[in-house]
């Protein structure tokens, strides 16, 4: 078993999603954006004794990686926007993932770029990913559990490619309105802030106001928006 010592944003993100799911559940779980088990998300689910777990990512799972060596979980290699909607899940977990959708990561497009155009992003791929999650919910007790960086910024890599969105009030509200269109709603919402990535405190939506922009780290997110979606 890997160490479950949590670091950085995972100090609040992982406890948040664990509080939303049952211990020892045999319900179906999907982890979006997971292929290498680097951030203690998968190990936390093992500690929670979740059994029926599937991972999905646009990247392949390494053959000699930790997940293949320590679990029998299925992996679906796919652009999540194209994910098969006949698959239904009780819990869909996305921890700091959708902010990368449609952008770049490790010099790789975080979408199926069949056009081959270098200077190209899909700005609303994140919202499409969240909508896709909603369509995979099994029933009204099922949950999509998401964390995203809150704030007014955008991160870029050394080549100038955008790699990470932050979510200000306007985009948060756009997500809330969009999921209403597919028969879903937020059933839980929390904000977390840390000045040093070690000591975290729970906040509220007031932290989204421009008067608090100065506390946001523009290089590494230090304000987290955590929320749960369910069918109406």
Residue spans of the language-model regions?
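Short, solvent-exposed loop/turn segments at secondary-structure junctions
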Residues: 9, 34-39, 59-63, 80-82, ...
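Short, conserved loop/helix-junction motifs that constitute active-site signature segments
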Residues: 24, 44-49, 136-138
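S-adenosyl-L-methionine-dependent methyltransferase catalytic module, highlighting the catalytic core
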Residues: 93, 101-231
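A short acidic, Gly/Pro-enriched loop at the edge of an enzyme's catalytic core
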Residues: 81-93
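Class I SAM-dependent methyltransferase Rossmann-like catalytic core
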Residues: 1-24
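Amphipathic, non-transmembrane alpha-helical secondary structure
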Residues: 15-22, 81, 127-131
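Receiver (REC) domain switch-region micro-motif
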Residues: 29, 92, 97
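Class I SAM-dependent methyltransferase SAM/SAH-binding core
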Residues: 30-83
């Amino acid at each position: 078993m890997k160490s479950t010592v949590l670091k950085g944003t995972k100090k609040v993100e992982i406890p948040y999603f664990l509080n939303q799911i049952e211990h020892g559940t045999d319900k179906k779980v999907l982890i979006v954006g997971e292929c290498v088990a680097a951030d203690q998300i998968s190990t936390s689910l093992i500690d929670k004794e979740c059994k029926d777990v599937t991972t999905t990512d646009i990247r392949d799972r390494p053959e000699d990686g930790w997940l293949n060596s320590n679990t029998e979980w299925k992996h679906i290699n796919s652009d999540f926007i194209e994910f098969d909607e006949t698959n239904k899940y009780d819990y869909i977990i996305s921890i700091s993932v959708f902010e990368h959708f449609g952008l770049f990561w490790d010099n790789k497009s975080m979408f199926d770029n069949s056009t081959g155009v270098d200077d190209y992003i899909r700005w609303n791929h994140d919202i499409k990913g969240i909508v896709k999650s909603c369509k995979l919910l099994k029933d009204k007790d099922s949950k999509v559990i998401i964390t995203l960086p809150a704030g007014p910024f955008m991160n870029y890599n050394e080549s100038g490619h955008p790699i990470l969105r932050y979510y200000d009030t306007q985009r948060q509200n756009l997500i809330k309105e969009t999921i209403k269109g597919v028969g879903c709603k937020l059933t839980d919402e929390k904000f977390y802030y840390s000045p040093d990535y070690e000591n975290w405190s729970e906040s509220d939506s007031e932290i989204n106001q421009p008067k608090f922009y100065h506390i946001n780290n523009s290089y590494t997110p230090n304000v987290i928006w955590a929320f749960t979606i369910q069918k109406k």
